[in-house]
Regions:
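N-terminal binding-site loop/beta-alpha segment at the start of enzyme catalytic domains
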Residues: 1-74, 105, 131, 137
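Glycine/proline-rich, positively charged
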Residues: 22-23, 29, 36, 85-204, ...
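Structural motif corresponding to the early beta-alpha repeats
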Residues: 52, 68-88, 113
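Short beta->alpha linker loops
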Residues: 52, 56, 149-150, 250
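Conserved, mostly hydrophobic/aromatic
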Residues: 14, 38, 46, 61, ...
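Short, electropositive alpha-helical surface patch
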Residues: 62-75, 129, 162-168, 259-265
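Structured C-terminal cap/extension of enzyme domains
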Residues: 29, 36-39, 43-44, 63, ...
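Short catalytic-loop micro-motif centered on adjacent basic/acidic residues
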Residues: 45-52, 142-146, 244-246
Length: 293
């Protein structure tokens, strides 16, 4: 059976929300180097949204990626963001603006952005899902999905009402796995129940799992020399239903590190899983994540 990930080369993606900056502008030279390194290492999945860097992320992708490489060299994901639409008639002009900003004539994936109970109600009321599915039928989108920020029961409702959804992007990392407010594990299990492949955002929890408390750092230092980010990203990528893990990289150094351990991906081994469990226990003990009871 054909999968929406058939043309995605590896399970690691370039999240373009924290690109390197020069003052208030994206550093195109540095970003181009990052794009080149990413593609040269065999990766091809890029993720953006109109709101990232106040619209500059899309423009940077046109300048650093889409104008420099053939269309078949990359997979590009964009999103329908609620900030920019109030009625159905707003959707197609906004979508066209995104295509032009990115310099492409179709998106490989297009996600309903940051869906929660309230935004889902807004999108339903304006028939946004139906419009995006029509764009898919017209060939302007290859695959249609959602990015999601709410409780698992809301996700279950959305996937029940719209079984046409092909992919779900969720916040997922080892600290949020059992967090009662994020419900990473429960959301992942809902996706599996509905047979939807998962894309992971925030695998390092906005950097929190890179800059660890001293006690937690000592635990990871006892492993075999991988970076803190490597253990967090590999944790997420080790789950069978997770097809893509995004990282919002902001430098060539971060890109080199991440490409190094994801190029020939290996799931966490037992020693590493036990170390991650100890780090989570330290976080809970310091009140940095809620106890699950």
């Amino acid at each position: 059976m054909q999968s929406c990930f058939d043309e995605v080369k590896k399970n690691f993606g370039f999240g373009c929300m924290r690109l390197p900056m020069k003052g208030k502008e994206v550093d195109f030279e540095e970003t181009s180097k990052m794009v080149d390194m990413f593609l040269a290492n065999g990766f091809n999945y890029f993720d953006t949204a109109h709101g990232y860097l106040d619209g500059q992320s899309e423009i940077a992708l046109k300048k650093c990626l889409t104008s420099r490489y053939p269309r078949e060299a990359y997979i590009l994901t964009n999103k329908l963001s609620g900030h920019y639409i109030e009625k159905n008639e707003d959707i197609r002009p906004f979508f066209q603006k995104q295509l032009e900003a990115c310099g492409v004539d179709y998106f490989d994936f297009y996600l309903m952005h940051a869906q929660n109970k309230d935004l889902f109600a807004k999108y339903k009321q304006m028939h946004a899902y139906e419009t995006v599915m029509a764009l898919r039928d017209e060939g302007k989108i290859r695959h249609f999905g959602i990015s999601f920020h709410d409780k698992a029961e809301v996700l279950d409702q959305i996937l029940t009402e719209y079984p046409q959804i092909e992919v779900v992007q969720i916040q997922f990392n080892y600290v949020d796995y059992e967090d009662t407010s994020v419900e990473s594990r429960k959301c992942y299990e809902v996706c599996c129940k509905h047979g939807k492949p998962v894309i992971v955002m925030e695998p390092v929890k906005g950097g929190s799992l890179v800059n660890l408390p001293e006690d937690a750092q000592k635990v990871l230092d006892g492993l075999h020399g991988g970076s803190n980010a490597s253990y967090a990203i590999r944790f997420a990528a080790s789950f069978p239903g997770i097809r893509m893990v995004l990282s919002g990289m902001g430098s060539t150094e971060m890109m080199a590190d991440n490409c190094g351990f994801m190029k020939d991906f290996q799931p966490l081994n037992e020693e590493e899983r036990m170390a991650i469990a100890r780090v989570c226990a330290i976080f809970r003990g310091q009140g940095l994540i809620p106890c699950t009871g």
